[in-house]
């Protein structure tokens, strides 16, 4: 079962993710709170990991130059041991937005819908972010809804919001939707990006 399928099958009628873990971590003795690893890296002042970003960038460029199953598998497997929040900043700083062509977009779509691991899905969100989340929202409404839906699972809320910010897109309707259906780290990150009247309202939402 893919991550996308798993998340969709565990959303209740209010859009809340009802499972406590994901299918790639089903047998963990102590499941980590969803979104906690990225939150730890991004909120504790941990330095980004440019080495990981460089490795991913080289593998992505190798795939874009030669889009074969072998090259795609190398990138897919490398992502397994990574943490999104560790590499996202140096990765987008180093990546030329012109590299996000139709091959990169198709790769992002493939990883998003077919990956059985969370980190590959987050990487797909980042590629979509470089392509332009606002553009996707306007031109690919079905894909946009799928991206927003997976962000209802708090493991992916940060990656979704971060990918919107890559091109300064601040979709308030989507952000308020996420606030209503999250309660942990996903809610914290959504409140950070929402437009509030003042800090008092922001604290009240928390």
Where are each of the predicted segments found?
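Generic helix N-cap/helix-start motif at coil->alpha-helix transitions
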Residues: 83-87, 115-123, 140, 151-159, ...
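Extended repeat-based scaffolds of very large eukaryotic assembly and lipid-transport proteins
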Residues: 1-137, 153, 157
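Alpha-helix initiation and N-capping motif
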Residues: 101-105, 172, 198
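Generic ordered-secondary-structure signal
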Residues: 12, 65, 104, 131-134, ...
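Alpha-solenoid HEAT/Armadillo-like helical repeat scaffolds in large eukaryotic proteins
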Residues: 107-115, 143-153, 163, 174-182, ...
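Core register positions within helices of long alpha-helical scaffolds
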Residues: 78, 127, 163-166, 193
């Amino acid at each position: 079962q893919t991550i996308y399928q798993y998340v969709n099958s565990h959303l209740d009628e209010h859009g809340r993710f009802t499972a406590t873990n994901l299918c790639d971590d089903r047998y963990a003795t102590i499941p980590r709170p969803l979104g906690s690893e990225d939150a730890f890296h991004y909120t504790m002042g941990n330095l980004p990991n440019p080495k990981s970003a460089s490795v991913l960038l080289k593998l992505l460029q190798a795939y874009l130059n030669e889009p074969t199953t072998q090259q795609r598998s190398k990138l897919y497997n490398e992502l397994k041991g990574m943490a999104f929040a560790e590499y996202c900043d140096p990765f987008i700083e180093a990546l030329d937005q012109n590299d996000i062509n139709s091959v990169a977009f198709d790769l992002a779509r493939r990883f998003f819908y077919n990956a059985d691991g969370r980190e590959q899905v987050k990487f797909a969100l980042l590629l979509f972010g470089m392509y332009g989340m606002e553009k996707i929202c306007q031109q690919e409404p079905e894909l946009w809804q799928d991206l927003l839906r997976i962000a209802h699972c708090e493991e992916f809320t940060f990656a979704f919001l971060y990918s919107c910010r890559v091109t300064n897109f601040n979709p308030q309707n989507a952000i308020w939707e996420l606030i209503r259906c999250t309660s942990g780290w996903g809610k914290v990150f959504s409140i950070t990006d929402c437009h509030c009247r003042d800090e008092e309202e922001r604290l009240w939402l928390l």
